[in-house]
């Protein structure tokens, strides 16, 4: 992987985005197995209906994982200096998630040329599910 060029980047530039496949019950089961989070809110339709919730929904950390993937498709994991995520809405079964990011600041940190990014994971209707910020070192 070739890191983006710090000098060629400008505030406002977008990083390459991606769209997930629809979140399915299989996605949730596989994520539960990998993460160890088997909470019935994400897996048991009878449980959630008894709570007055129409259907199971995605783990919040699944969206964070997708935003991590957005970053590591752009820079090596070792270049990530900080990564913080806020969960803003529930991801429903069947939704495709669109992960996007843009440069909001160029800075020098601990002698490294870095960029600060704003990242968003939203459904196809534009409803943000997760918002994040990250700092990555480029030189």
Where are these regions (language model features)?
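HotDog/MaoC-like acyl-thioester-processing domains
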Residues: 1-15, 90-139
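Catalytic strand-loop segment that frames the active site of acyl-thioester-processing enzymes
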Residues: 1-56, 138
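Short, intrinsically disordered, mixed-charge
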Residues: 33-36, 72-76, 124
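Hydrophobic beta-strand-centered segment that forms part of the acyl-chain substrate-binding groove
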Residues: 49-58, 62-103
């Amino acid at each position: 992987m070739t890191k983006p060029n710090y000098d060629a980047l400008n505030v406002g530039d977008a990083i390459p985005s991606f769209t997930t496949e629809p979140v399915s019950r299989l996605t949730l089961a596989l994520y539960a197995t990998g993460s160890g989070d088997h909470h019935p809110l994400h897996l048991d339709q009878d449980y959630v209906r008894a709570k007055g919730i129409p259907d199971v929904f995605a783990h919040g950390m699944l969206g964070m994982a997708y935003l991590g993937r957005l970053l590591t498709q752009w820079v090596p994991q070792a270049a990530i200096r900080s990564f913080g995520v806020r969960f803003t809405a529930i991801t429903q079964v069947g939704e495709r998630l669109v992960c996007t990011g843009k440069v909001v600041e160029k800075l020098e940190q601990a002698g490294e040329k870095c960029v600060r990014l704003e990242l968003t994971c939203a459904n196809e209707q534009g409803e943000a599910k997760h918002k994040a910020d990250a700092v990555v070192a480029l030189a």
